[in-house]
Amino acid sequence: MIIGIDVGGTHTDGVLLGINSPNGEGYEILATSKVRTQKDNLMKSILEVLDVLLAAAQVPDIKRIVLSTTLAANVIVEENYDPVGLVLIPGPGLNPEHLLIGDENILLSGYINHRGIEVRDLEQEELLKGLERIKARGIKNLAIVSKFSTRNPGLEAEVLQLIREKDYPFENISLGHQLSGRLGFPRRLVTAYFNTAIMSVYRDFVQAVEKALEERELDTGVFVLKCDGGTVPLDRVMEAPIETVNSGPAASIMGTMAMTGVYQNKETAIALDIGGTTTDIGLFIKGEPAFMPEGIELNGFPTLVRGLYSLSLPLGGDSKIAVKDGKLKIGPERDGPAAAFGGPSPTPTDALLVLDYIQDDPDYEGRADLQAAREALVALAGDLDPTEYGRCWQDGKLDLTEFASFIIDKMLASIVETIQEILASLENKPVYTISELLAGVEIRPQLLLTMGGPASALSPLLAEKLGYREEVVPYAKVANAVGAALARPTLQTTVRVDTAASYLHIVEAGIHRQLKAGEDYDLEEVEELAMAWTRKRADDETAVVEISERESFNVIRGFRTIGKIMEVRAQIKPGLISRPEGSEN
């Protein structure tokens, strides 16, 4: 059996999957669970989900548990993290002033060149003064990033060593070279900055998971979904938590792929997960999820974190509705649950209840206080400028149904506008899927695939505005947890060989060494080395590994070739281990 759990900002969802085929490859959904996320007590939320799922398993033989979460992503979007200091070693040729995104920034002398050779040493006095400045401000989080550190991490390691020797009180530290094997100094420092920023949040998350499993005496493999739709073991998450920052949207996309026929039918579609806090938007092109191999963006900053293409709109069923200067405003804040469930502010969920769109839903029926929803909306309408919202009044009286309809129209208009902006931004650009680069492809979605609590109510309305066919994903309220449960483990390894300098780098494995006497490589051998190390790091000698990038060029000196520089990236491609019974064919 497999358990998938998605820890969202509003709800924690879970599914229990059991094998239903003789060869052990097919799965069926045995049980589901959905509880409110208690941010100050994650262990309790996870335990509540586990208890429901384990109770449904007559013989709880759990082989694998996979989790996804939006907690870290929400922290970044809301900028609700502790200050981070940046130690930058940029070297020549780049004005670093526009890179200073830390709460305190140190620019150091010394640098590594593009061949990985240390050209200039660090100046220790300069470094110590900078660290003292960060310490004086009480900053506990630090990111250390040197240009070309993937080709020689020596300067980053030297800074870390001095911090430890002097016993500086930094609690969370990221080194740029440990987060990606690819070049890109600006992207690397942003990646290191946000990796440090979410370390505390992820440490709490990992500890909550470990305690929950210990409470229920579960001794099994535990994984976390990454941004690229693959998984990483829980005990390795803290090596680079930034890789899982968008695991919530990735779970939605993988769940859509698992539970619908979009992949089999090679369709181009928009995927929506309408949650309580956000609406996550994904894109399928000819049946495969769109991919960002250069790196996702976080708060408008490009990173080196490879991931599925997604955009989280801070708009959901529990978004706070307010009136500012006589105008209606929905989100981005969430002020608790809907008024119908005891929350302090009206929300789109209250409007849906007033319109009787979700009244018969088992999750709302009998629990929702419809009168509280009505009263919250009536109180809100009193502050509106009637000249702009005339349709909501009839003969000087508020038409509550019309007002609720206006709220939902405004919410849908925001989602539709964002989808159209996404498609316009991709027009005439090369796009990637998890399998290939597509050049010159027209992205013309005809299908809308929706999941989340209000999906059944909102999907037809959205599809009408977009002019698409629509389909509510089976098990729409927990399909994200299905996507997490069935995601395949993934891994990427970068190998760089410089035969002229006689040096070998296996970046993600932390290997940077001189070539031994008689040790030589051609491009094919570098590819074999990259694939072998990918399997080794995944601890799976049977894993299917592919070469995602390769380059090779001669090193010329004095009009003659003195060696080659070869760089190869190998990866286990993201995908599903199976599709569950009951999904669309």
Which residues does each PLM region occupy?
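N-terminally biased helix-coil "hinge/interface" segments that flank
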Residues: 1-585
